Amino acid sequence: MSKQQPTQFINPETPGYVGFANLPNQVHRKSVKKGFEFTLMVVGESGLGKSTLINSLFLTDLYPERIIPGAAEKIERTVQIEASTVEIEERGVKLRLTVVDTPGYGDAINSRDCFKTIISYIDEQFERYLHDESGLNRRHIIDNRVHCCFYFISPFGHGLKPLDVAFMKAIHNKVNIVPVIAKADTLTLKERERLKKRILDEIEEHSIKIYHLPDAESDEDEDFKEQTRLLKASIPFSVVGSNQLIEAKGKKVRGRLYPWGVVEVENPEHNDFLKLRTMLITHMQDLQEVTQDLHYENFRSERLKRGGRKVENEDMNKDQILLEKEAELRRMQEMIARMQAQMQMQMQGGDTDSSTLGHHV
């Protein structure tokens, strides 16, 4: 009597079905179980609402004990690096978010070299990842590479400042730059559009490489294609941040209250906050891939070239030392040979003198 086949191994599909179609589900389950890692850097002058915006984006307080420096402290203030990591879980999906803040950027009177500290930090994370990747234990590498940089631009100017241009050009080959116009509630809608166009023109004029959202695939649904088009058209994002709940039209919303009305943070008609958050969430994977495939690979290739040249130089130095040692040894041997010849001649001369003296006696 034949045993009944276990039901869990019965193929419910049509004949010829193998099951490869379930691979994406396996990858998804594995990724969800492992969790995601993302590092966001925020750079901009003090007073542009960077901390408020980040807290608004992720509904968390990353800077509970921050002390705001006075004007006198800012004069000689240097750029600092403050990395805050928080574990966020939403519907079973875990995100290890690291926000790298740069207090002191642009505060000092002489801000020419203020971005060197930031560049060093970005390179250090690449260096650490390269070291861990080259080690024996590669299963538990923590990825602290900077995947995205929100660069905050002041709404009070008429475009990019020289410092903005210099900084973005200094890092655009190392990290994905997303330009953000801060405190958009200080501008009218027409002023925002003029400022956006001016900034984009100056970015193109100075050949600054910012992060470009990839085009939607042809097989994507129309809603996603339209969303991608709107996100692209919104760059640079003009945003408002607030952690205060106020009442507007009978409901509680996060926003800012003015004598003339309420600016709602999450109202797309008031600012680009929702678009910025949507861009970050929907393109988080692409930001990581561009970091891995472009910025990190550029760093890695250059680093290995420098390492190769260093090894070559060391080998050349060793060969040079050996040649010098051999030449010195030959000189010593020649000198010893000459000394031996002189001693031989002196000994022969002494024998002749002795024989002469004996003959006279």
From Swiss-Prot:
Region of interest called G4 motif, as start-end residue ranges on this chain: 182-185
Gene3D superfamilies: P-loop containing nucleotide triphosphate hydrolases
Pfam families: Septin
Region described as Important for dimerization: spans on this chain: 260-270
Residue numbers carrying Phosphoserine: 218
Septin-type G domain sequence ranges: 34-306
Cell compartments where the protein resides: Cytoplasm; Cytoplasm, Cytoskeleton; Cytoplasm, Cytoskeleton, Spindle; Cleavage furrow
Region (G1 motif): 44-51
Keywords for this protein: Acetylation, Cell cycle, Cell division, Cell membrane, Cell projection, Cilium, Cytoplasm, Cytoskeleton, Differentiation, Flagellum, GTP-binding, Membrane, Mitosis, Nucleotide-binding, Phosphoprotein, Spermatogenesis
Gene Ontology CC entries for this record: axoneme; cell division site; cell projection; cell surface; ciliary membrane; ciliary transition zone; cleavage furrow; cytoplasm
Database matches in InterPro entries: G_SEPTIN_dom, P-loop_NTPase, Septin, Septin2
Modified residues (Phosphotyrosine): 17, 211
GO molecular function: enzyme regulator activity; GTP binding; GTPase activity; molecular adaptor activity
GO biological process, one term: spermatogenesis
TM region positions: none
Recorded superkingdom: Eukaryota
Stretch list, region G3 motif: 101-104
Subunit structure as annotated in this protein's UniProt entry: Septins polymerize into heterooligomeric protein complexes that form filaments, and associate with cellular membranes, actin filaments and microtubules. GTPase activity is required for filament formation. Septin filaments are assembled from asymmetrical heterotrimers, composed of SEPTIN2, SEPTIN6 and SEPTIN7 that associate head-to-head to form a hexameric unit. Interaction between SEPTIN2 and SEPTIN7 seems indirect. Also interacts with SEPTIN9 and SEPTIN5. Interaction with SEPTIN4 not detected.
Note: Coordinated expression with SEPTIN2 and SEPTIN7.
Family the entry assigns: Belongs to the TRAFAC class TrmE-Era-EngA-EngB-Septin-like GTPase superfamily. Septin GTPase family.
Function recorded in the entry: Filament-forming cytoskeletal GTPase. Forms a filamentous structure with SEPTIN12, SEPTIN6, SEPTIN2 and probably SEPTIN4 at the sperm annulus which is required for the structural integrity and motility of the sperm tail during postmeiotic differentiation. Required for normal organization of the actin cytoskeleton. Plays a role in the biogenesis of polarized columnar-shaped epithelium by maintaining polyglutamylated microtubules, thus facilitating efficient vesicle transport, and by impeding MAP4 binding to tubulin. Required for the progression through mitosis.
Name under which the protein is recorded: Septin-2
Gene: Septin2
